[in-house]
Amino acid sequence: MTKVGLRIDVDTLRGTREGVPRLLATLHRHGVQASFFFSVGPDNMGRHLWRLIKPRFLWKMLRSNAASLYGWDILLAGTAWPGKNIGNANAGIIRETATYHETGLHAWDHHAWQTHSGHWSIRQLEEDIARGITALEAIIGKPVTCSAAAGWRADGRVVRAKESFNLRYNSDCRGTTLFRPLLMPGQTGTPQIPVTLPTWDEVIGPAVQAQSFNTWIISRMLQDKGTPVYTIHAEVEGIVHQPLFEDLLVRARDAGITFCPLGELLPASPESLPLGQIVRGHIPGREGWLGCQQAASAS
């Protein structure tokens, strides 16, 4: 049996309102639990449209057929009008999720984090994280114990900024296996659970067709030599590609794969995890930099 951590990112108002309820129903039908990470502040995701001037982002949008994949309400959110507050508008849905699944913070403002966190000060990072955690805790009525940086925009500064929140783990980067981030000689931070597998929008296109994606990603899960972690998005697998995701759950079960919340991947003694660090890097299919796992001894 292959255990795969299932991470569900919720970036937008529509993803929360429409995608999450469908995902909850789908997961319930198949007896699967996952980790949901919510954006709880304003939905300004439409402001990413300026990135269309960047060839790699434009190609990604064309390759994934973004207009039909996400919908124009998502692609234009927060452009001509102020972004609506996601948490306030969908508190009941978020509370229901937290009743049945591990629930953590994705971002206060997903667009702001993805666009500006790379040059924010530690204090600005801490204030933004605190704002998101405070809002999410007010909604679910219990402490937030985990987080996942929006767009995997994380580096050593983000690791340090999250230390004061006493989280059980963070999932801020791409990598191969769980690790303890090295803060300074002799001091380590909150365990990191990297995402190890590609997302739908990173690979779909000429090389991998939609109808063959599930076969392809299951093969990658079975071949993963580290700790497999797979990310889906409420805006994609919860809406237009919900039937495809349900088919994935069936095929994965038949292949001997068991999905679980990320927290279940943590060992009883996190001190046994190897040391590492998060550095800025790039991966195929995703525009811009993102946090990548690196061995602590690397320069």
UniProtKB/Swiss-Prot annotation:
Any one Gene Ontology cellular component term annotated for this protein: membrane
Reaction it catalyzes: 4-deoxy-4-formamido-alpha-L-arabinopyranosyl di-trans,octa-cis-undecaprenyl phosphate + H2O = 4-amino-4-deoxy-alpha-L-arabinopyranosyl di-trans,octa-cis-undecaprenyl phosphate + formate
Domain NodB homology as annotated: residue spans: 2-260
Sorted UniProt keywords: Antibiotic resistance, Hydrolase, Lipid A biosynthesis, Lipid biosynthesis, Lipid metabolism, Lipopolysaccharide biosynthesis
EC number: 3.5.1.n3
Induction (free text): Induced by BasR.
PROSITE patterns the UniProt entry points to: NODB
Family: Belongs to the polysaccharide deacetylase family. ArnD deformylase subfamily.
Protein name (database record): Probable 4-deoxy-4-formamido-L-arabinose-phosphoundecaprenol deformylase ArnD
Species lineage: Bacteria, Pseudomonadati, Pseudomonadota, Gammaproteobacteria, Enterobacterales
